[in-house]
């Protein structure tokens, strides 16, 4: 079924540009296609996508609900982002490569069976793919989705997918967020469909018809981990977390309301009803744990289960602590619901194994304590308890191994918030002392439970506790430094190293604490007693809180429940008290440990050793005996301590010991500030603790985590020194704001700045020295290089001069011919050069030949690179002249005078010019805008296309109105003297108006001077002519002539296929004319050259020609009045003769022109001649020279006694000029000819018969400027009417014999043949005069549109240029043979009279100035003109045949029939003259019978 039939049957439509524009108009889009970014083509019945090439800016294209079967036609839509192709007939996804920015693709309801060609390599930003309701079936059809790395929305609903392996495909789609699979069989086949897909797609947020919430994902992960039970628990946790969140928001509102009410009117807080059972279970478990003296679970509750509360009041916090309504599940679920701060594990930093406790205890026992007397305990009464919250709790680990009962101690330390490095200490202080805290905190936890009973024993052993704390600090520090010495690269070691450096930096400020007197220790007992009373008060207070909460219980309890709740209340009260005590003890312990560690830095080992008394040494020995550690461990620890002491000796030297006696009042007054600051530090230190995301193993302790997860979750923060904060903390904590302290700080800063300044000065000095040495080195190198460069330049110049000279000499030699091996046997041939591979590449054999220095350097660099990397392509074959030309052009440019003007322009002047141009452009834009605004009312009407014209349709009346004319063009110059081409041309008289003003008639002297100048500058003249020709070729402005004559050109060139020419009797006259091709060209050129000189210039030129011809040198004559009078008289006579002849020709009735028909060309052909010669131009040059010479001989002979020579020679002068002009134009073998006219030399050259046109057609082709041509044509028409139709074929057979050199032909035969040939020539001449213009649209346009150029000067230039060329070519040519043969022709034609010696001499000399010599008179009557034309035609043909006989026995050269419009310039220095001898055969018309044989001797000049 054909395409057209299918279209008719289906009724489908095509996308056409017109239809698309109509749709744009309907949708109120732009009519210019590229301005639209959307296009609505849905519901149109289109069967294919086409004609969208112009819509290059489209971003959205709607094509749904059509009949499109193939994706195509999108090649130009590179910016398309959305393509909607649903409800079509598409079977394959293809041809989307050009749409690289496609984001959304909808292919629903098509016939697609496989997803393909949409990978990231083709559609790199594809985000949404909708491919529902297709024929997708299995995982193979979806396998290409893995390549879609950016696809996040995928709709596969209502397909036929039943393969469960698609889950693996979705698992590999990293960006998939939305997936729609409903309507596929696989939904029912997948077990646990929704959970499976949620687990497979990590980023999935929407599945089928509802979102994927975080709760869904958590339940799915729990189901994967623990089955349905885990899923149920996880679901309950989320539900409780949601209820808890709601309850907390309500309780917060109740608290805000209660804060403004009296206590008796306050509302109770809400409690959880569904978690009562969990609460009872928890309280029972706690009670049992307390009775069994096990606090592991209690500590877990402390570290993990504290309710989150912001910095609220202590009342609300304690109420929340006493609620007891929350469980571990509640808290975890709540944390999970707040995804911003997920905390699935205890917020602890480091947990250590049990062995750490033992090793620390051993280290403590084995180490000798120092400086026990300096231990200071502060008054505890100043310390306010800090409420422990889960976010703020210091992260201290507790290992589940109870310590030995003997080592249980309660440590009460001096609480100080002192720090000197701000943020560094905040982040590190809790992490660094983890081991110490583990030991001490376990001790605290176990002892605080029985704190009421053991309070007295605490104060008894306080001295021992003080020593234990000191030993613990020393042990930690020494152990960390031992690890540093052993270079154990673990996290603990790195942190210890950092904290040691920090302590050393701030050691200088810590000396105020180490020397306090022993009397401060007297405060210990009072402080402890005060603390005990404080604890008991706090205990009572907490009991009251619990009792109040209990009263607010709304439910009635049974007796057992009441008893159980009383036990729970007791346990809760203890727990609350213990929590507060632990928090306070922790802060005191931390402060004491930090202060003790800092004090150690400031001590020197020698002073400590001197300060020890015998009692202290005995006490240390006693302690060492009491410690239960083995002697081996004690010895090892002593060795390590010796290493550390040696290291600290070097560090401690040079540090001065400062003793500041600060009173107890000052200490107590600064305690409040220190407490507040340390509380802030403690809060800030716990802010950056990394939280672990809830996941697998959330309930396990962090000691059981794998090492990789520890590193991921607990990253180390960078330690950065902050000097500004350091100074602030020093001043604020230590209150060292005295004048001396400030002076010391200033001195230290000054010293530091001085050191930095000295270092900078030294660096600057080094840089200056380096720069100076580099400058000196560069100077020495440059001086050396300049010498080398000068030597190389001179050498290269010499080489280049020699090579250039050799190259010139080589060019002057004649071409040599290479012969092959002469011997028969190549193997033993000595003359045959063996084919060996050259070692040096040809491009490097003569690298400097004809090259500049730059090219030589480039060649050398290419050679070096080729040697370094042989795989690189060889770049040595560069054009050797391009660089030279560039250098010469640059030199000429530097010498030009315009550069000075160019450099004279400054930036200001150029900016001012640019500003003027911008201002001018703004004015034009403003004017255009004003014009448009003034006509705004008109443009409310609509534009419609009426009869292929754009018309204005009035909105109110509906009338049609023409468009207003466009505004006149504004010229760039905006000047009134702007000349255009139209100003120069004045139609009507065919003349030209000179653009430089009207020239007066020039005198003879002026004309002669101009001619002499032109002769001297002959090369320039030829170049100018070439330039003028180029200029003429550039002046082509329209293609109308091509459309008018295109068909005729095609027909003409088709008929130029001369193989198809048939010889016929009707074409014999045209064939005869074609033999005198040069005469034909003369006719063609005569019209265009005849009237381009005015009469006065023509007269003067002809007089000068005669003078130059006779004397050989132009003589400057003084103007004489008589000669001028004679010239004027002759001019008047000639004008009268022209008028009479014109009148006679007008009386002759002309044929009535018939209706013009299409121009057709007939075919005809003959063999003109063959030229067997390798010299391309000289043979023809001789032919032209002989031709003009013969014309001169004939005219001289016929008009010896004629006294009106000067007047009549003007008639013949254009003929001679034209023949000379065309001598170089007719044949140029160097220029490649047209394809249709490129003949082989052995083929027969066929001739085109001229077209038979009516006189009306010919006359219509003439322009008004050719009156003189018309006169000659009318005269020739008479001969045509008399002779053309009486022409018989038998005469044509005899015509070829008339062209030979035979002197036996009689005059009457020749005359009759000549008359008939003249008729054909006349007919052909009429056509040929205008044929080249008729076929050349450039000529037509040049003459009709632009106006003819002033061809007078051009013709003079051409004449003299060709005279010089011909003169130089024929300087040494001997014409004896040609002269004799020509003389025979003249004798046979006009009688027995001979040329005398002077005429011979003149004729020989005539070859030197061939075109300067005037031709002599032709009779004015038509009869004499006919005879002359007959003789001329015969002689021309004979001479051409003679010239073609200058041959060498080589391939023949065919003469082409199309003239070359450009001039061929021959260099006279390249000519060579040789004597040649050849045999000449004159053939008949068919070219197969030899009519006559001649032998010719001549001297020939050739290149």
Swiss-Prot record:
Regions crossing the membrane: none
Residue stretches making up the LRRCT domain: 185-223
Biased composition (Low complexity): 1303-1314
InterPro entries listed in its UniProt record: Cilia_flagella_integrity, Leu-rich_rpt, Leu-rich_rpt_4, LRR_dom_sf
Gene: dtr
Places the protein is found: Cell projection, Cilium
GO molecular function: dynein complex binding
Function text: Cilium-specific protein required for cilia structures.
Keyword Repeat: yes
UniProt repeat feature LRR, residue ranges: 34-56, 57-78, 79-100, 101-122, 125-146, 150-171
GO biological process, one term: axoneme assembly
Source organism of the structure: Drosophila erecta
Bias type Basic and acidic residues, positions: 1014-1031
Name used for this protein in its record: Dynein axonemal assembly factor 1 homolog
């Amino acid at each position: 079924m054909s395409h057209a039939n299918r279209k008719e049957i289906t009724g489908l439509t095509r996308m056409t540009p017109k239809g698309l524009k109509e749709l744009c108009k309907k949708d109120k889009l732009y009519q210019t296609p590229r301005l639209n970014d959307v296009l609505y083509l849905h519901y149109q019945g289109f069967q294919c996508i086409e004609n969208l090439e112009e819509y290059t800016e489209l971003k959205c294209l709607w094509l749904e609900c059509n009949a499109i079967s193939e994706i195509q036609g999108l090649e130009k839509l590179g910016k398309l982002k959305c393509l909607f192709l649903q409800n079509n007939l598409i079977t394959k996804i293809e041809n989307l490569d050009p749409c690289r920015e496609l984001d959304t693709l909808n292919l629903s309801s098509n016939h697609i069976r496989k997803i393909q060609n949409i990978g990231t390599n083709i559609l790199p930003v594809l985000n949404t793919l909708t491919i529902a309701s297709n024929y997708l079936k299995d995982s193979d059809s979806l396998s290409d989705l893995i390549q879609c790395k950016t696809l996040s929305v995928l709709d596969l609903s209502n397909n036929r997918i039943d393969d469960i392996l698609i889950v693996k495909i979705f698992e590999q789609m990293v960006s998939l967020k939305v997936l729609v699979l409903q309507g596929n069989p696989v939904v029912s086949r997948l077990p646990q469909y929704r959970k499976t897909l949620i687990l497979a797609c990590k980023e999935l947020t929407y599945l089928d018809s509802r979102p994927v919430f975080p709760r869904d994902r958590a339940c799915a992960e729990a189901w994967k981990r623990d089955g349905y039970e885990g899923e149920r628990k996880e679901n309950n946790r989320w539900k409780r977390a949601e209820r808890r969140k709601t309850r907390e928001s309500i309780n917060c509102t109740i608290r805000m309301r209660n804060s403004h009410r009296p206590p008796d009117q306050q509302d109770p807080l809400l409690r959880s009803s569904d978690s009562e059972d969990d609460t009872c279970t928890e309280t029972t478990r706690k009670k049992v744990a307390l009775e069994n003296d096990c606090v592991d679970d209690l500590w877990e509750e402390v570290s993990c289960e504290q309710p989150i509360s912001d910095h609220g009041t202590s009342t609300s916090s304690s109420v929340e602590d006493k609620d007891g309504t929350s469980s571990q599940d509640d808290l975890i679920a709540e944390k999970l619901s707040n995804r911003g701060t997920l905390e699935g594990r205890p917020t602890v930093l480091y947990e250590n194994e049990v062995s750490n406790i033992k090793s620390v205890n051993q280290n403590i026992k084995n180490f000798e304590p120092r400086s026990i007397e300096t231990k200071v305990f502060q008054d505890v009464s100043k310390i306010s308890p800090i409420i422990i919250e889960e976010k703020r709790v210091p992260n201290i680990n507790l290992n589940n191994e109870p310590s030995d009962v003997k080592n249980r101690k309660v440590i009460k330390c001096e609480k100080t918030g002192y720090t000197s490095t701000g943020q560094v200490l905040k982040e590190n202080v809790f992490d660094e002392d983890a081991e110490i805290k583990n030991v001490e905190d376990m001790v605290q936890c176990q002892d605080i439970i029985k704190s009421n009973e053991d309070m007295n024993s605490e104060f008894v052993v306080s001295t021992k506790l003080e020593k234990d704390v000191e030993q613990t600090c020393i042990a930690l520090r020494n152990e960390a430094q031992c690890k540093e010495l052993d270079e154990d690269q673990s996290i603990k070691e790195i942190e210890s190293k950092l904290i040691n450096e920090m302590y050393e930096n701030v050691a200088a400020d810590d000396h105020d604490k180490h020397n306090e007197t022993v009397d401060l220790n007297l405060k210990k007992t009072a402080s402890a007693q005060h603390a005990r009373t404080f604890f008991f008060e706090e205990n009572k207070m907490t009991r009251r809180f619990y009792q109040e909460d209990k009263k607010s219980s709304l439910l009635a309890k049974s007796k057992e429940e009441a008893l159980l709740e009383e036990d729970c209340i007791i346990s809760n009260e203890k727990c609350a008290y213990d929590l507060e005590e632990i928090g306070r003890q922790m802060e005191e312990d931390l402060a004491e440990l930090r202060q003790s560690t800092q004090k150690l830095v400031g001590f020197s080992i020698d002073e400590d050793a001197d300060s020890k008394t015998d009692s202290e040494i005995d006490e240390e020995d006693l302690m060492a005996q009491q410690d239960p550690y083995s002697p081996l461990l004690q010895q090892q620890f002593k060795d390590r301590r010796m290493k550390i002491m040696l290291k600290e000796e070097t560090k401690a030297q040079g540090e001065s010991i400062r003793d500041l006696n600060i009173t107890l009042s000052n200490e107590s007054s600064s305690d409040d500030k220190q407490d507040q600051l340390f509380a802030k530090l403690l809060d800030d230190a716990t802010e950056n603790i990394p939280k672990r995301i809830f996941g697998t193993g959330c309930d396990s302790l962090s000691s059981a985590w794998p090492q990789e997860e520890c590193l991921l979750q607990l990253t180390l923060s960078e330690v950065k020194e902050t000097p500004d904060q350091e100074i602030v903390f020093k001043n604020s904590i230590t209150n060292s704001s005295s004048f001396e302290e400030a002076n010391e700080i200033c001195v230290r800063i000054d010293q530091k700045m001085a050191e930095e300044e000295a270092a900078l000065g030294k660096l600057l000095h080094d840089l200056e020295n380096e720069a100076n040495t580099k400058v000196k080195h560069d100077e020495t190198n440059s001086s050396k290089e300049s010498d080398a460069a000068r030597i190389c330049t001179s050498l290269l110049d010499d080489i280049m001069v020699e090579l250039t000279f050799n190259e010139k000499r080589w060019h002057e030699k004649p071409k040599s011919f290479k012969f092959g091996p002469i011997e028969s046997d190549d193997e033993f041939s000595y003359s045959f050069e063996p084919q060996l591979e050259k070692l040096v590449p040809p491009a490097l054999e003569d690298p400097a030949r004809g090259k500049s220095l730059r090219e030589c350097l480039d060649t050398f660099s290419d050679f070096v690179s080729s040697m370094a990397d042989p795989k690189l392509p060889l770049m040595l074959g560069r054009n050797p002249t391009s660089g030279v030309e560039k250098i010469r052009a640059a030199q000429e440019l530097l010498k030009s005078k315009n550069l000075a003007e160019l450099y004279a322009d400054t930036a200001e002047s150029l900016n001012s010019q640019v500003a003027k141009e911008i201002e001018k452009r703004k004015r034009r834009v403003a004017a255009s805008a004003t014009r448009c605004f003034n006509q705004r009312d008109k443009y409310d009407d609509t534009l419609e296309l009426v009869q292929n014209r754009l018309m204005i349709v009035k909105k109110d009346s509906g009338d049609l109105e023409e468009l207003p004319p466009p505004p006149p063009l504004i010229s760039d110059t905006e000047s009134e003297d702007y000349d255009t081409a139209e100003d120069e041309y004045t139609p009507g008289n065919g003349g030209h108006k000179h653009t430089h003003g009207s020239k007066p008639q020039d005198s003879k002297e002026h004309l002669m001077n101009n001619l002499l100048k032109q002769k001297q500058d002959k090369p320039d003249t030829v170049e100018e002519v070439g330039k003028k020709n180029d200029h003429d070729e550039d002046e082509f402005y329209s293609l109308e002539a091509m459309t008018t004559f295109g068909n005729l050109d095609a027909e003409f060139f088709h008929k130029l296929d001369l193989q198809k020419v048939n010889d016929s009797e009707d074409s014999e006259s045209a064939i005869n004319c074609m033999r005198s091709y040069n005469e034909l060209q003369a006719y063609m050129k005569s019209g265009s050259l005849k009237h381009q000189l005015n009469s006065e210039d023509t007269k003067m030129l002809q007089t000068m020609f005669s003078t130059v011809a006779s004397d050989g040198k132009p003589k400057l004559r003084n103007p004489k009045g008589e000669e001028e009078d004679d010239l004027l008289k002759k001019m008047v006579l000639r004008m009268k003769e022209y008028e009479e002849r014109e009148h006679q020709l007008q009386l002759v009735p002309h044929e009535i022109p018939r209706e013009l028909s299409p121009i057709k060309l007939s075919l005809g052909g003959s063999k003109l001649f063959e030229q067997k010669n390798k010299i391309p131009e000289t043979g023809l040059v001789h032919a032209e020279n002989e031709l003009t010479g013969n014309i001169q001989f004939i005219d001289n002979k016929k008009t010896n006694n004629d006294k009106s020579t000067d007047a009549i020679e003007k008639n013949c002068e254009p003929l001679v000029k034209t023949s000379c002009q065309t001598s170089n134009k007719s044949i140029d073998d160097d220029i490649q000819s047209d394809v249709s006219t490129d003949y082989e030399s052995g083929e027969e050259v066929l001739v085109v018969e001229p077209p038979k046109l009516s006189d009306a057609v010919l006359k219509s082709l003439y322009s008004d400027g050719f009156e003189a041509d018309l006169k000659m044509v009318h005269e020739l028409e008479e001969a045509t009417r008399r002779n053309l139709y009486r022409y018989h074929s038998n005469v044509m057979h005899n015509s070829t014999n008339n062209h030979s050199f035979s002197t036996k032909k009689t005059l009457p035969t020749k005359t009759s043949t000549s008359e008939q040939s003249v008729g054909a020539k006349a007919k052909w001449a009429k056509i040929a005069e205008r044929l080249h213009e008729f076929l050349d649209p450039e000529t037509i346009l040049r003459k009709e549109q632009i106006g003819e150029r002033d061809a007078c000067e051009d013709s003079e230039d051409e004449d003299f240029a060709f005279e010089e060329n011909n003169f130089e070519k024929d300087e040494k040519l001997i014409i004896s043979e040609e002269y004799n043969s020509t003389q025979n022709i003249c004798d046979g034609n006009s009688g027995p009279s001979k040329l005398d010696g002077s005429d011979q001499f003149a004729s020989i000399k005539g070859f030197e100035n061939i075109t300067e010599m005037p031709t002599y008179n032709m009779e004015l009557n038509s009869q004499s003109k006919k005879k002359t034309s007959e003789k001329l035609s015969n002689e021309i043909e004979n001479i051409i045949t003679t010239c073609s006989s200058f041959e060498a026995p080589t391939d023949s050269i065919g003469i082409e029939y199309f003239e070359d419009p450009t001039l061929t310039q021959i260099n006279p220095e390249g000519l060579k003259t040789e004597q040649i001898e050849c045999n000449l055969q004159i053939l008949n018309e068919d070219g197969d019978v030899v009519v006559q044989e001649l032998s010719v001797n001549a001297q020939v000049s050739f290149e």
